[in-house]
Amino acid sequence: MAPTRDEQHWMYRNMVTSRRFEETIAKIYFEGKSPAFNMANGPIPGEMHLSDGQEPVAVGVCAHLTPEDVVTATHRPHHRAIAKGVDLDKMAAEIFGKATGLSGGRGGHMHLFDADVNFACSGIIAQGMGPAVGAALSRKMQGKPGVAVAFVGEGAVNQ
Protein backbone atom coordinates (compact mmCIF):
# COMPACT_ATOMS: atom_id res chain seq x y z
CA MET A 1 0.00 0.00 0.00
CA ALA A 2 1.36 3.42 -0.96
CA PRO A 3 1.91 5.98 1.81
CA THR A 4 -0.72 8.68 2.20
CA ARG A 5 0.09 12.32 1.45
CA ASP A 6 0.45 13.02 5.19
CA GLU A 7 2.80 10.05 5.57
CA GLN A 8 4.85 11.26 2.61
CA HIS A 9 5.12 14.71 4.19
CA TRP A 10 6.19 13.18 7.51
CA MET A 11 8.83 11.11 5.74
CA TYR A 12 10.20 14.08 3.82
CA ARG A 13 10.24 16.37 6.86
CA ASN A 14 11.92 13.67 8.90
CA MET A 15 14.65 13.12 6.30
CA VAL A 16 15.30 16.87 6.00
CA THR A 17 15.33 17.29 9.78
CA SER A 18 17.77 14.39 10.12
CA ARG A 19 20.10 15.77 7.46
CA ARG A 20 20.05 19.31 8.88
CA PHE A 21 20.56 18.05 12.43
CA GLU A 22 23.58 16.03 11.43
CA GLU A 23 25.03 18.80 9.25
CA THR A 24 24.74 21.21 12.17
CA ILE A 25 26.27 18.76 14.63
CA ALA A 26 29.14 18.07 12.20
CA LYS A 27 29.86 21.76 11.71
CA ILE A 28 29.95 22.40 15.44
CA TYR A 29 31.94 19.25 16.13
CA PHE A 30 34.74 20.11 13.73
CA GLU A 31 35.08 23.67 15.03
CA GLY A 32 38.18 23.73 17.18
CA LYS A 33 39.37 20.28 16.12
CA SER A 34 42.94 19.99 14.97
CA PRO A 35 43.91 18.17 11.75
CA ALA A 36 45.05 15.36 14.04
CA PHE A 37 41.45 15.15 15.35
CA ASN A 38 42.32 16.01 18.92
CA MET A 39 39.05 14.87 20.46
CA ALA A 40 39.58 16.89 23.63
CA ASN A 41 39.12 20.18 21.77
CA GLY A 42 35.84 21.66 20.65
CA PRO A 43 32.35 21.97 22.11
CA ILE A 44 31.33 18.33 21.60
CA PRO A 45 33.31 15.77 23.62
CA GLY A 46 34.50 12.48 22.19
CA GLU A 47 34.17 11.07 18.71
CA MET A 48 31.50 11.75 16.10
CA HIS A 49 30.17 9.20 13.65
CA LEU A 50 27.98 10.62 10.91
CA SER A 51 25.75 8.87 8.40
CA ASP A 52 24.91 11.33 5.65
CA GLY A 53 22.71 9.79 2.99
CA GLN A 54 21.23 7.09 5.20
CA GLU A 55 18.16 9.12 6.18
CA PRO A 56 15.76 7.23 3.87
CA VAL A 57 16.62 3.89 5.46
CA ALA A 58 15.72 5.05 8.96
CA VAL A 59 12.60 6.89 7.82
CA GLY A 60 11.44 4.06 5.57
CA VAL A 61 11.63 1.54 8.39
CA CYS A 62 10.35 3.73 11.21
CA ALA A 63 7.39 4.94 9.14
CA HIS A 64 5.92 1.47 9.60
CA LEU A 65 6.52 1.20 13.33
CA THR A 66 4.23 1.98 16.24
CA PRO A 67 5.25 3.85 19.40
CA GLU A 68 5.42 0.50 21.23
CA ASP A 69 7.91 -1.00 18.76
CA VAL A 70 11.56 -1.10 19.79
CA VAL A 71 14.51 0.22 17.79
CA THR A 72 18.19 -0.35 18.50
CA ALA A 73 21.05 1.21 16.58
CA THR A 74 24.83 1.31 16.51
CA HIS A 75 27.39 4.13 16.61
CA ARG A 76 25.69 6.13 13.82
CA PRO A 77 22.33 6.61 15.50
CA HIS A 78 21.11 10.13 14.72
CA HIS A 79 18.75 9.39 11.81
CA ARG A 80 17.30 6.34 13.50
CA ALA A 81 16.73 8.23 16.75
CA ILE A 82 15.02 11.12 14.97
CA ALA A 83 12.85 8.78 12.89
CA LYS A 84 11.80 6.89 16.03
CA GLY A 85 10.80 10.14 17.72
CA VAL A 86 13.63 10.94 20.12
CA ASP A 87 13.36 14.55 21.31
CA LEU A 88 15.83 16.68 19.31
CA ASP A 89 16.60 19.06 22.18
CA LYS A 90 17.35 16.23 24.60
CA MET A 91 19.42 14.40 21.99
CA ALA A 92 21.43 17.54 21.22
CA ALA A 93 21.97 18.14 24.94
CA GLU A 94 23.24 14.58 25.29
CA ILE A 95 25.65 15.02 22.39
CA PHE A 96 26.98 18.23 23.98
CA GLY A 97 27.43 16.48 27.34
CA LYS A 98 24.76 18.55 29.11
CA ALA A 99 22.86 17.43 32.20
CA THR A 100 19.57 17.98 30.35
CA GLY A 101 20.48 15.25 27.85
CA LEU A 102 18.78 11.89 27.52
CA SER A 103 21.27 10.28 29.93
CA GLY A 104 22.35 13.38 31.77
CA GLY A 105 25.09 14.08 29.25
CA ARG A 106 27.02 10.94 30.15
CA GLY A 107 26.26 8.79 27.10
CA GLY A 108 27.28 11.06 24.27
CA HIS A 109 26.17 10.57 20.70
CA MET A 110 26.91 6.83 20.53
CA HIS A 111 24.91 5.85 23.61
CA LEU A 112 21.53 7.51 23.17
CA PHE A 113 18.67 6.02 25.17
CA ASP A 114 15.06 7.13 25.28
CA ALA A 115 12.67 4.74 27.00
CA ASP A 116 9.73 7.03 26.17
CA VAL A 117 10.01 6.10 22.47
CA ASN A 118 11.67 2.67 22.88
CA PHE A 119 15.02 3.66 21.36
CA ALA A 120 18.52 2.64 22.39
CA CYS A 121 21.91 2.53 20.74
CA SER A 122 25.47 1.60 21.56
CA GLY A 123 28.89 2.39 20.17
CA ILE A 124 29.68 -1.32 20.09
CA ILE A 125 29.26 -2.73 16.59
CA ALA A 126 26.30 -5.15 16.31
CA GLN A 127 25.47 -4.71 20.00
CA GLY A 128 21.82 -3.88 19.33
CA MET A 129 20.90 -7.27 17.91
CA GLY A 130 20.73 -9.04 21.28
CA PRO A 131 18.57 -6.40 22.97
CA ALA A 132 16.26 -6.27 19.94
CA VAL A 133 15.79 -10.04 20.07
CA GLY A 134 15.18 -9.80 23.81
CA ALA A 135 12.60 -7.04 23.33
CA ALA A 136 10.80 -9.07 20.67
CA LEU A 137 10.82 -12.21 22.82
CA SER A 138 9.56 -10.24 25.81
CA ARG A 139 6.65 -8.90 23.79
CA LYS A 140 5.80 -12.35 22.50
CA MET A 141 5.94 -13.95 25.95
CA GLN A 142 3.74 -11.21 27.41
CA GLY A 143 1.25 -11.49 24.55
CA LYS A 144 1.87 -7.88 23.53
CA PRO A 145 1.86 -6.75 19.92
CA GLY A 146 4.88 -5.13 18.35
CA VAL A 147 8.19 -5.71 16.69
CA ALA A 148 11.82 -4.90 17.36
CA VAL A 149 14.24 -3.54 14.77
CA ALA A 150 18.03 -3.64 15.04
CA PHE A 151 19.80 -1.27 12.67
CA VAL A 152 23.32 -2.51 11.91
CA GLY A 153 25.89 -1.66 9.28
CA GLU A 154 27.64 -3.91 6.82
CA GLY A 155 30.54 -4.36 9.23
CA ALA A 156 28.22 -5.93 11.80
CA VAL A 157 26.67 -8.53 9.54
CA ASN A 158 29.34 -11.15 10.23
CA GLN A 159 29.43 -10.62 13.99
Can you name each region flagged by the protein language model?
Residues 35-159:
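Cofactor-binding active-site loop characterized by glycine-rich and histidine/acidic residues
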